[in-house]
Amino acid sequence: MTATIEETQETGSAGVGRIARVIGPVVDVEFPVDSMPEIYNKLECELTLEGEAKILSLEVAQHIGDGMVRAISLQPTDGLVRGAQVTDTGGPITVPVGDATLGKVFNTLGEVLNLEEGETFEVKERWGIHRKAPAFDQLESKTQMFETGIKVIDLLTPYVQGGKIGLFGGAGVGKTVLIQEMIARVAKDHGGVSVFAGVGERTREGNDLIVEMEEAGVIGQTALVFGQMDEPPGTRLRVALSALTMAEYFRDVQGQDVLLFIDNIFRFTQAGSEVSTLLGRMPSAVGYQPNLADEMGTLQERITSTRGHSITSMQAIYVPADDYTDPAPATTFAHLDATTELSREIASLGIYPAVDPLTSTSRILDPQYIGQAHYDCAIRIKQILQRNKELQDIIAILGVDELSEEDKIIVSRARRIQRFLSQNTYVAKQFTGIEGSTVPVSETIEGFNKIADGEYDHVAEQAFFMCGGLDDVEQKWAEIQKSL
């Protein structure tokens, strides 16, 4: 059974039930037949654990019949007993919205996690996390490029203002670093409000992100919502909706362009799979939940642009065992406007961001959106890199000397292009000691055209590595020549 809750819900008449069964995070609760809570309603149960009283929150997932509902706990169920009293709040989980959320760290239930001692948090309005996607006639039809200042992204996989962007990659190839870099760049170059959803985030990563944002002075324009890796699956499944609800308020009520960062969509799918198994549903392909496409669509369809206002979403997506045919990443592909695939092979060369220029895609890599000059340059660079890839087998067997003169030139320029696609990032400065760089799109196009034309054939390959524009390359080349 499903139900959709619209707009801000008022608490209805509260029903009271009793716990009938507890199996891990799954709790069966018996209510009077005439006051059963609706699907997605939040239930509360008071319990005492080690002498400390606390309120446990649950969300109704199924109606079993005869007044019995099955709920998923959003907190550990230690200390929960049969017969304990449960109260129906009359509405879904709600989270605080508005300017008061900026600079704060929340959990899935909208509770603040970073209050100083003696500090209080008051908010005028709370919204339910289950909401309808905007109607078709409210959507924005205009398409505009979102400039990041990162060469490989702006040139070959341009992002869409108000679009959905996926950062795909296996473990350890730089998804979270790229997400953190985009947060830093948005705050530095674009201003505006950001919302970050840590779905199944490692505690260390979350802490690093908060510290970096505080040091950069950008946390005051960001709301952060975490459902950490060690929390029950119900929490991890709903944390993205909590963050999205906060972002929707900034878009719909305040009329702002919002950036929504989600790390990691795979763990959203994984949490849904755990909940589905706990509820006894028959698993689908590779053990995933049978309603995977529906669950993903419910989240993704709400991330969109309405007339004049947008939510631009950047989503890190873990690819299990680097297998892109796995149902979790494959289901996400259909919803995205741009895909940035991070390659372990490119990362092993020390080229960062480790974006694969040949497999990454964008809906707006088209002359009508980005202009003919940008499109021609991108296609030209892709052709050179593709030809270089085709020649690698010949080089591995026979060596470079066996290539034709034309192919030797292509390989030489492709190697320079590969290295010029690397770039220092602001968030990696603490490791490298080198300041990040932002390169305008016009400068990026000019630089790659000059390399493809052969104007920099005389410059050593290492001079192109981790540079911003061609000025940096020339400066580095001059330093290399001095040291020879």
UniProtKB/Swiss-Prot annotation:
CDD domains: ATP-synt_F1_beta_C, ATP-synt_F1_beta_N, F1-ATPase_beta_CD. It catalyses: ATP + H2O + 4 H(+)(in) = ADP + phosphate + 5 H(+)(out). It is found in: Cell membrane. Keywords: ATP synthesis, ATP-binding, Cell membrane, CF(1), Hydrogen ion transport, Ion transport, Membrane, Nucleotide-binding, Translocase, Transport. It comes from the Bacteria. InterPro entries: AAA+_ATPase (IPR003593), ATP-synt_VA_C (IPR055190), ATP_synth_F1_bsu (IPR005722), ATPase_a/bsu_AS (IPR020003), ATPase_alpha/beta_chains (IPR050053), ATPase_F1/V1/A1_a/bsu_N (IPR004100), ATPase_F1/V1/A1_a/bsu_N_sf (IPR036121), ATPase_F1/V1/A1_a/bsu_nucl-bd (IPR000194). Signal peptide: none annotated. ATP binds at residues 169-176. SUPFAM superfamilies: C-terminal domain of alpha and beta subunits of F1 ATP synthase, N-terminal domain of alpha and beta subunits of F1 ATP synthase, P-loop containing nucleoside triphosphate hydrolases. GO terms for molecular function: ATP binding; ATP hydrolysis activity; proton-transporting ATP synthase activity, rotational mechanism. It is a peripheral membrane protein. Its EC number is 7.1.2.2. Transmembrane segments: none annotated. GO terms for cellular component: plasma membrane; proton-transporting ATP synthase complex. Belongs to the ATPase alpha/beta chains family. HAMAP family: ATP_synth_beta_bact. Produces ATP from ADP in the presence of a proton gradient across the membrane. The catalytic sites are hosted primarily by the beta subunits. F-type ATPases have 2 components, CF(1) - the catalytic core - and CF(0) - the membrane proton channel. CF(1) has five subunits: alpha(3), beta(3), gamma(1), delta(1), epsilon(1). CF(0) has three main subunits: a(1), b(2) and c(9-12). The alpha and beta chains form an alternating ring which encloses part of the gamma chain. CF(1) is attached to CF(0) by a central stalk formed by the gamma and epsilon chains, while a peripheral stalk is formed by the delta and b chains. This is ATP synthase subunit beta.
